[in-house]
């Protein structure tokens, strides 16, 4: 049983390894903590790029839950892309990274706000037991994209 738990723990750590690291800021020699900045490209909405800043503790079994996220439109967003996403109130997970060998995970979830024609990217940390559930939110308005114009045309056609 121990070997199985160790294998699962190590594999989840490898899932969190990212070659999308764009920044690494040391918080000091004696803290042994760094702020890592990674870029995330949404697989379904190719015109969106998010940057996530989170703290990594080098000699710790668990990284702090603090993180921030900033997402921007960096390319075209088409009606076909919006049609392909989960439009439920809970949206869908677009990124997941292990933050601890004790089942703590940072997730980024995409949620669509149809009334305001906006994509929301919610970064949060989950832990199977008690813990602090810190979160951060970034929005990407569809204003000025092909997806927004198509939505507006459909509303006018329905009237």
Where are the model-predicted features located?
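C-terminal motif of bacterial Sec signal peptides marking the signal peptidase cleavage site
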Residues: 13-16
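C-terminal partner/receptor-binding element of secreted or periplasmic proteins
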Residues: 115-159
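Residue-level signal for mature regions of secreted extracellular proteins and peptides
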Residues: 10, 43-44, 64
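Sec-dependent signal peptide recognition
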Residues: 2-7
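Extracytoplasmic
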Residues: 32, 45-47, 66
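Post-signal peptide N-terminal segment of mature Sec-exported envelope proteins
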Residues: 24-43
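Mature extracytoplasmic domains of secretory-pathway proteins
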Residues: 49-116
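Bacterial signal peptide processing site
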Residues: 18-20
């Amino acid at each position: 049983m121990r070997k199985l738990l160790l294998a699962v723990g190590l594999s989840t750590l490898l899932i969190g390894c990212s070659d999308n690291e764009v920044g690494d800021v040391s918080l000091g020699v004696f803290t042994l903590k760094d702020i890592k900045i990674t870029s995330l490209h949404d697989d379904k909405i190719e015109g969106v790029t998010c940057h996530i800043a989170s703290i990594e503790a080098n000699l710790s079994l668990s990284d702090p839950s603090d993180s921030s996220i900033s997402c921007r439109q960096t390319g075209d967003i088409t009606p076909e892309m919006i049609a392909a996403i989960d439009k439920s109130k809970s949206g869908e997970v677009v990124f997941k990274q292990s933050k601890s060998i004790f089942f703590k995970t940072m997730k980024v979830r995409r949620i669509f706000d149809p009334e305001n024609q906006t994509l929301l990217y919610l970064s949060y940390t989950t832990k199977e037991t008690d813990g602090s559930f810190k979160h951060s939110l970034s929005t990407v308005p569809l204003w000025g994209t092909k997806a927004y114009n198509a939505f507006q045309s459909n509303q006018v056609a329905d009237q």
